[in-house]
């Protein structure tokens, strides 16, 4: 799946937010892609035939939100970049759109074509916001040296890799 590979590729860089999130990014990118695909299926398919798309969207949304939460709580200081500025706004929008789209798809999407289409559009938009939010957070972390220096010092204090970025 291209989404997973993209997550692996950006995590294998020296960009602090992306590198520190290397365990979660492939899951986030795969789940976000599944969520968007399910959302697109909800938009395109008749309500009676969109059950598999709704299920894929709901599962993708749950995994996406869980992996994002895990990443945000495990990154330490670098997680600041996911909550501030443009990245923070995009990540907040991604959570709201993804959750609303998933709930709307499950609750209303099986009865109303308009609700299914609106929920599907919210899921696709949430996926886009996730990708661009992570991109912006990586850019922000690359421009501020403390997001490189502080994690390196913390690894050294724990007896880690003498400040080198580990993969």
Which stretches of residues belong to each language-model region?
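Short amphipathic, positively biased membrane-proximal segments
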Residues: 1-167
